[in-house]
A protein has these predicted regions:
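Residues in well-ordered alpha-helical elements
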Residues: 17, 33-36, 50, 182
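Short, acidic/polar
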Residues: 12-30, 78-82
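Short, small-residue-rich loop/turn micro-motifs
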Residues: 1, 34, 126
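N-terminal binding-site loop/beta-alpha segment at the start of enzyme catalytic domains
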Residues: 5, 33, 61
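Active-site mouth loops of central-metabolism enzymes
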Residues: 3-20, 41-47
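A short, structured active-site edge motif that brings together acidic residues
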Residues: 1-5, 96-99
Length: 190
């Protein structure tokens, strides 16, 4: 939870009302009684961290989630959340953050060190940078691509001439290794 679930107040971010209602809706859609991990997908600048973590703990205490995960938190905020969840005796086990050859933010924002210090797991999303680290965009933007038709997470501004040149250099490096660009990107992550 953390992104748009419905229009209007409390349809987004990290309030108790939003988190618990979105969990209930997700469980109903999936036909499940509980999820293994309930993620909060982004820190909420308007809601106190204590409220957000309290809602996650309530989800576990009610039996609707076995564990808690966080996504898109930096190191310092994750450690604050971890301290709150420890006080609430809530099992926080994993972080999920964007990481790729093109997005290395977690190396600079303290998350890697915080995960090691707190002994929390880390799983990445978008290791292919929304498809940029594939052969799809090596020669520009295809007419039928998400970049042209959607643009919410991948848009034309992200494929600058400099970025395209970098992708072509990475493609050459991948070919020198007998790989496709996507394979090189996945090996880099591992």
């Amino acid at each position: 939870a953390g992104y748009d679930m419905w229009e209007g107040p409390y349809g987004n971010w990290g309030s108790r009302k939003y988190l618990l209602a979105s969990l209930d809706q997700s469980l109903k859609r999936m036909g499940l009684e509980y999820v293994d991990i309930f993620y909060h997908h982004r820190p909420d600048p308007e809601t106190p961290l204590e409220e957000t973590m309290g809602a996650l703990a309530q989800a576990v205490q009610s039996g609707k989630a076995l564990y808690v995960g966080l996504s898109n938190y930096d190191g310092a905020t994750m450690q604050q959340a971890c301290a709150i969840l420890k006080e609430l005796h809530c099992p926080f086990v994993i972080n999920q953050n964007c990481y790729s050859m093109l997005n290395r933010t977690i190396e600079q924002n303290g998350l890697l060190d915080a995960c090691a210090e707190e002994q929390k797991g880390l799983i990445v999303f978008s290791p292919l940078a929304q498809g940029l680290l594939t052969d799809r965009y090596l020669h520009g933007i295809p007419a039928d691509s998400r970049m042209r038709t959607d643009g919410r997470f991948l848009n034309e501004k992200q494929l600058t001439p400099e970025r395209l040149q970098l992708l072509q250099k990475l493609q050459a490096a991948a070919q020198a290794r007998g790989q496709k660009l996507a394979q090189l990107a996945m090996h880099w992550i591992l």
